[in-house]
Amino acid sequence: MTERFVYHGSNIIVDKPKILTNGFFKDFGYGFYCTNLEKQAKRWAMTRRNNHIVNVYKLKELDAFNKLIFDSMNEDWLNFIVNCRRGLEHNYDVVEGPMADDTIWNFIEDYIGGDISKEAFWELVKFRYPTHQIVFCNEKALQAVIFERAYSL
């Protein structure tokens, strides 16, 4: 198996990841969020005050976990994000797929509010740059995330 690495942008070194269950509801619910796109983790880190740190993790095999993987933005992805952003819980250990950034989230809110149709939503998001996120939703899933190193930007 090829080694797989994921990245987490922050203002601190996160050598012991934790499941965060506070703040606003996120795309895939509460958990520890990473990406396989180093450039995206750098963008996340640059949004932080003071320090800009990219944490690098090696992933163990994920086959034993209850996973939900979205290969693209599709109807199931949209429905899942809407439910998670509304605070509905799920029973997955790991969820992976495209990210609804602020612009896409605005379109989702417009769709939820009935301001745009589902067809208009898909038209608006189809030209967005590729994004990726993987969330580790519980302590069991965090066992697959092995801290390798961190670096400052």
Where are these regions (language model features)?
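Short aromatic-glycine-(Arg/Gly/Cys) micro-motifs in beta-strand/loop hairpins
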Residues: 3-26
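Conserved NAD+-utilizing ADP-ribose enzyme module
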Residues: 2, 27, 47-53, 58-153
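Short, conserved beta-strand segments within well-ordered enzyme catalytic domains
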Residues: 6-8, 33-34, 55-58
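A generic structural signal for ordered alpha-helices
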Residues: 16-22, 35, 82, 86
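Extended catalytic/binding region for NAD+/ADP-ribose chemistry, centered on the ART fold
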Residues: 23-47
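A broad, structure-centric signal for solvent-exposed, well-ordered loop/edge residues
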Residues: 14-16, 41, 66
